[in-house]
């Protein structure tokens, strides 16, 4: 209640000017040590202070809310909403605990250790590409491509499909926050295509397992349980979106 008494008027998080000059909008709040801000259109609260964030994350009275935020914006159906219903980041215990335990089974110490040489190789390849141009945008040429390339490699997604993965994940990420109608439509279209692609990928790994993360997720077990097809698809897509 003390925090809410000092929360300023709501902020439109979809305003491009906000992200072009965030310091001009948030600077006064931070300098005055205002602890939180409201997100216009959702009733959501942004916490700014590390201690408050840690306390909120450990408070059992607070939860992930599932798809409630989407529904509050009138987005109640379609591929994006369905994906979020099965997305680990939108779940609370015990569902979240179960999925996390299964996914952790697939991220073995050996698999994580093998990422270092892969990461070095990909980084060198991207830097070599950058050196061929007189001027480059580091974000577009490296920062955006590097993590997605690593995740795609872990999932054994062919190099030829990496560009399509980037387009899909860009559309999905554009739909987070307070998306426009066109952004919602693009995200739904991207999710529908990704679900089909990932479904085919899972079927291939079921019939011909490899030493990749998809195969690891398929065969991961915890207390006799494993991921079903819907959970597998949602998890693989979440890894790709997180790696964007």
Question: Where are each of the predicted segments found?
Answer:
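Alpha-solenoid HEAT/Armadillo repeat architecture
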Residues: 89, 108, 112, 203, ...
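Active-site substrate-recognition loop segments, prototypically the cytochrome P450 B′-helix/B-C loop
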Residues: 1-139, 151-166, 170-180, 185-189
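Central I-helix of cytochrome P450 enzymes
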Residues: 144, 148, 152-153, 194, ...
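A residue-level signal for conserved active-site and pocket-lining positions in enzyme catalytic cores
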Residues: 49, 103, 147, 198, ...
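Alpha-helix boundary/capping and short turn/kink residues
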Residues: 93, 112, 159, 207, ...
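Cytochrome P450 catalytic core segment centered on helix I
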Residues: 126, 167-225, 229
């Amino acid at each position: 209640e003390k925090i809410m008494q000092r929360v300023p008027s709501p902020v439109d998080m979809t305003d491009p000017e906000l992200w072009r000059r965030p310091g001009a909008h948030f600077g006064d709040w931070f300098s005055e040590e205002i602890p939180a801000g409201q997100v216009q259109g959702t009733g959501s609260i942004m916490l700014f202070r590390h201690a408050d964030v840690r306390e909120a994350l450990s408070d059992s009275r607070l939860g992930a809310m599932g798809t409630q935020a989407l529904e509050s914006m009138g987005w109640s159906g379609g591929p994006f909403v369905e994906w979020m219903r099965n997305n680990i980041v939108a779940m609370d215990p015990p569902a979240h605990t179960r999925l996390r335990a299964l996914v952790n089974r697939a991220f073995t110490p050996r698999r994580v250790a093998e990422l270092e040489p892969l990461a070095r190789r990909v980084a060198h390849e991207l830097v070599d590409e950058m050196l061929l141009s007189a001027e480059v945008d580091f974000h577009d040429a490296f920062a955006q491509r590097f993590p997605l390339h690593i995740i795609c490699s872990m999932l054994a997604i062919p190099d030829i499909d990496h560009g399509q993965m980037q387009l899909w994940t860009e559309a999905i990420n554009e739909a987070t926050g307070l998306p426009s109608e066109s952004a919602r439509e693009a995200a739904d279209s991207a999710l529908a295509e990704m679900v089909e692609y990932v479904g085919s990928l899972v079927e291939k790994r079921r019939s011909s397992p490899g030493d990749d993360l998809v195969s690891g997720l398929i065969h991961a077990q915890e207390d006799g349980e494993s991921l079903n097809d819907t959970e597998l698809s949602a998890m693989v897509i979440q890894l790709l979106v997180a790696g964007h």
